[in-house]
């Protein structure tokens, strides 16, 4: 059920309403001499792109476009408005978009003193716009829907190591419970992880090829304990075309694991300040070639 947030701005022009969609893909903001001349929004509806249509008047200054990533959504729109010469009503002078993942657009138009913010008190996602338009964009309002995505999205940090092997990705979970590292003669032959998602234990697949040396385990006292960083090394070894991960060491908010594998080659660290590690990805063949993580902000 979408919530309608009333339009702010002036009373000029005629009212328009794009209605409610699944989300916003792109916003084209028409530039005017004194502010925003028009708006045209591309929405997502049943995985199709739907154009809302142009509201306002196109000028020779053209459009500026704000694109929303597929795994992101708009949570707030900061709007300024003012009375400009030649208009009998306030017009929208600038629009700035804020997304869930922390992306902020530049202000489109010219920022002025009077302002309002379109947002949902429950942090919902923007799924439609409405307002008033004519010779310019006079007023802007929005629809917000409660979102089913978790309150904090996970972020994928790039994997480090060699380019050989097949890519694998366990995705992101609520947390990590257990780490299994397969020992190889010259480094790490395989990895496997046990995750937690909504009080359910999920064991990810085996990535790489286990050897007779078996797996070593590192257990995390989830949920009070969580992984904050992974240190490791990678190197070129005899008989292998590319780089392989030779050692991994896991750091939590309470302890540091023993090094798994053989510390040799170039050192690396995977971490993001103020985040915990909630998933892993990489590349593997008969050995582990590349290793990366998914992180999520720490919540109090």
UniProtKB/Swiss-Prot annotation:
Domain Jacalin-type lectin residues, every copy: 2-146, 154-297
One record GO biological process: response to zinc ion
Cited InterPro entries: Jacalin-like_lectin_dom, Jacalin-like_lectin_dom_plant, Jacalin-like_lectin_dom_sf
CDD domains: Jacalin (cd09612)
Keyword Acetylation attached: yes
Keywords in alphabetical order: Acetylation, Lectin, Repeat
Pfam family, one: Jacalin
Record note on quaternary structure: Component of the PYK10 complex, at least composed of PYK10/BGLU23, BGLU21, BGLU22, JAL22, JAL23, PBP1/JAL30, PBP2/JAL31, JAL32, JAL33, JAL34, JAL35, GLL22 and GLL23.
Known function: Sugar-binding protein showing significant affinity for (Glc alpha(1-4)Glc)(3) maltohexaose, (Glc alpha(1-6)Glc)(3) isomaltohexaose, Gal alpha(1-4)Gal beta(1-4)Glc, GalNAc alpha(1-3)(Fuc alpha(1-2)) and Gal beta(1-3)(Fuc alpha(1-4))GlcNAc beta(1-3)Gal beta(1-4)Glc.
Xref: SMART domains: Jacalin
GO cellular component: nucleus; plasmodesma
Family indicated by similarity: Belongs to the jacalin lectin family.
GO molecular function: carbohydrate binding
Top-level division of the source organism's lineage: Eukaryota
Region (Disordered), start-end ranges: 1-20
The protein's name in its UniProt record: Jacalin-related lectin 33
Annotated organism of origin: Arabidopsis thaliana (Mouse-ear cress)
N-acetylalanine carried by residues: 2
């Amino acid at each position: 059920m979408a919530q309608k947030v009333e339009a702010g701005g002036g009373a000029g022009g005629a009212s328009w309403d794009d209605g409610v969609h699944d989300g916003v893909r792109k916003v084209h903001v028409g530039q005017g001499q004194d502010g925003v001349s028009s708006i045209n929004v591309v929405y997502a509806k049943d995985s199709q792109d739907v154009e809302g249509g142009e509201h306002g008047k196109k000028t020779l200054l053209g459009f500026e476009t704000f694109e929303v990533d597929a795994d992101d959504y708009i949570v707030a729109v900061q709007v300024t408005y003012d009375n400009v010469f030649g208009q009998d009503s306030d017009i929208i002078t600038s629009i700035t978009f804020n997304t869930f993942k922390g992306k902020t657009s530049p202000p489109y138009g010219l920022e002025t003193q009077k302002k309002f913010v379109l947002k949902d008190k429950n942090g919902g996602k923007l799924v439609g716009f409405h307002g008033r338009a004519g010779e310019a964009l006079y007023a802007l309002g929005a629809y917000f829907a409660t979102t089913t995505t978790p309150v904090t999205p996970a972020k994928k940090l790039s994997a480090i190591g060699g380019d050989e092997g097949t890519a694998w990705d366990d995705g992101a979970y609520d947390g990590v419970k257990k780490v299994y590292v397969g020992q190889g003669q010259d480094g790490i032959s395989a990895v496997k992880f046990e995750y937690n998602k909504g009080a359910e234990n999920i064991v990810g697949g085996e990535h790489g090829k286990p050897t007779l040396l078996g797996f070593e385990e590192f257990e995390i006292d989830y949920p009070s304990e969580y992984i904050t960083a992974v240190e490791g090394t990678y190197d070129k070894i005899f008989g292998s075309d590319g780089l392989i991960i030779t050692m991994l060491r896991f750091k939590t908010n309470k302890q540091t694991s023993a090094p798994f594998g053989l510390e040799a080659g170039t050192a690396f660290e995977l971490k993001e300040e103020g985040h915990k590690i909630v998933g892993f990805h990489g590349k593997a063949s008969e050995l582990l070639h590349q290793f990366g993580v998914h992180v999520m902000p720490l919540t109090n």
